[in-house]
């Protein structure tokens, strides 16, 4: 049985009452129904995030953003997952401070250390009662998610990467790290995003089963793949992977 590491998690705004699971009328890119929080990375940096989905639930997903973006790029997908019963945490990496609904994390930008931000996000969800977890990352967020998964072992049930590079500004995953990722792995990239497509091949060859490579006909990168010409296929692949390896507990009504 897992023993979650408890860290303080500070609510900033009262959660908006949820209607019909997560509010079917809520725009997918909206923060309505979400809760703004702060939490700490595993090396003590205070980060800004948002919780989407139901107040309770054992299945959780951490969404990690790419470099030229922030947590708001995930809001539409976070809402969709929340409506399916997942507890979803988006967050800004250290030093990323877009402001407004997108939040503002403390610290300086330090890309080689951001895997510790992902670890902190995992602890934040665990402190809320989540016991089955997936890490989903775009570009550098995917690289950081693989590193975190290699360290957290069986605490992570699935990892999904969108256009993740093997290395970026001092953040990197080599064969020795990839070999430690026991979670079910889904690697997605576009064939016109050449470096990302090559990375999928490398990741697939250096990791254990279960794993799946998906190369699509597109030049979109990271979270842009969820709004581009292959958006439907990308989201379907991701949701199917989550449903298979991080299923939401279904309530069974009695006779």
Indicate where each model-derived feature is located.
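Conserved alpha/beta-hydrolase
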Residues: 81-102
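Short beta-strand/loop motif that positions the catalytic acidic residue
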Residues: 181, 187-189
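Short beta-strand element of the alpha/beta-hydrolase
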Residues: 58-66
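Catalytic histidine neighborhood in serine/cysteine hydrolases
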Residues: 207-223
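Alpha/beta-hydrolase active-site loop
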Residues: 73, 106-128
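N-terminal cap/lid segment of alpha/beta-hydrolase-fold proteins
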Residues: 25-53
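The serine-hydrolase catalytic nucleophile loop
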Residues: 67-79, 199
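Primarily recognizes the serine-hydrolase "nucleophile elbow" in alpha/beta-hydrolase
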Residues: 123-182
């Amino acid at each position: 049985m897992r023993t979650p590491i408890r860290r303080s998690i500070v609510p900033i705004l009262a959660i908006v009452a949820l209607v019909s699971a997560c509010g079917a009328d809520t725009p997918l890119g909206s923060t309505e129904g979400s809760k703004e929080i702060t939490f700490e990375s595993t090396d003590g940096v205070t980060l800004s995030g948002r919780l989407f989905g139901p107040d309770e639930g054992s299945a959780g997903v951490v969404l990690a953003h790419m470099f030229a973006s922030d947590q708001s790029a995930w809001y539409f997908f976070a809402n969709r997952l929340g409506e399916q019963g997942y507890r979803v945490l988006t967050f800004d990496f250290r030093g990323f401070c877009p402001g407004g609904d997108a939040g503002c994390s403390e610290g300086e930008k330090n890309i080689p250390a951001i895997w510790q931000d992902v670890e902190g996000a995992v602890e934040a969800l665990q402190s809320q009662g989540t016991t089955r977890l997936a890490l989903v990352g775009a570009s550098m967020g995917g690289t950081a998610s693989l590193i975190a998964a290699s360290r957290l072992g069986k605490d992570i049930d699935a990892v999904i990467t969108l256009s993740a590079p093997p290395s970026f500004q001092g953040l990197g995953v080599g064969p020795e790290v990839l070999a430690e990722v026991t979670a079910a792995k889904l690697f997605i990239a576009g064939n016109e995003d050449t470096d990302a497509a090559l990375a999928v091949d490398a990741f697939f060859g250096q990791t254990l089963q279960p794993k799946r490579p998906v190369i699509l006909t597109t030049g979109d990168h990271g979270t842009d793949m969820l709004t581009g010409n292959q958006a439907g296929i990308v989201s379907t692949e991701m949701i199917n992977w989550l449903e298979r390896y991080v299923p939401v507990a279904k309530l069974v009504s009695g006779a």
